């Protein structure tokens, strides 16, 4: 992949190009766009977001078969904003959000906020999050533990609910 200016970019390049006119502020989306350019075949055309709800909400994003982000959120509003940014800018045939069932009140809040704020369809899967928390030697690495739990949640199966935007269902 070559990163260049729009002016210097050849019109018919044999290798993937990323030009400087890209105006993506979300690093996860930028990583996803780079993967899109590099993956011509798209063997796995899916976007999977794993969420470990709690005081510190773990977050993991898998796109085209690769993990492109892993982070920690202290507020649900910031989490929802980032999920909406990712869902709206990364295109995939299958878009799935997997949420752990450890805090169902928070799981339902996340689901409802996504349904209210995002005007497109996606699937939500509530998964059993037992045994997703790994033992970490140093107590101060709890954020790392929540992010790893989100990754494990994104790899589990559960009950899938298709969410249609309220604008389509009334």
Where do the language-model regions lie?
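Phosphate- and other anionic-substrate recognition elements at nucleic-acid/protein interfaces
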Residues: 1-48, 55-170
């Amino acid at each position: 992949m070559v990163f260049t200016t729009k002016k210097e970019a050849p019109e018919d390049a044999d290798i993937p190009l990323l030009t400087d006119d890209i105006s993506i502020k979300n690093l996860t989306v930028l990583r996803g766009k780079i993967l899109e350019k590099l993956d011509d075949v798209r063997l796995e055309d899916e976007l999977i977001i794993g969420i470990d709800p709690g005081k510190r909400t773990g977050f993991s994003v898998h796109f085209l078969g690769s993990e492109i982000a892993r982070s920690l959120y202290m507020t649900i509003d910031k989490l929802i904003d980032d999920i909406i940014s990712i869902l709206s800018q990364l295109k995939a045939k299958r878009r799935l959000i997997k949420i752990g069932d450890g805090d169902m009140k928070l799981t339902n809040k996340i689901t409802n906020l996504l349904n209210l704020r995002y005007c497109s369809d996606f699937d939500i899967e509530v998964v059993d999050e037992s045994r997703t928390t790994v033992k970490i030697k140093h107590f101060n690495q709890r954020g790392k533990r929540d992010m790893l739990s989100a990754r494990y949640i994104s790899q589990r199966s559960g009950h899938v609910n298709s969410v249609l935007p309220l604008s389509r269902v009334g």
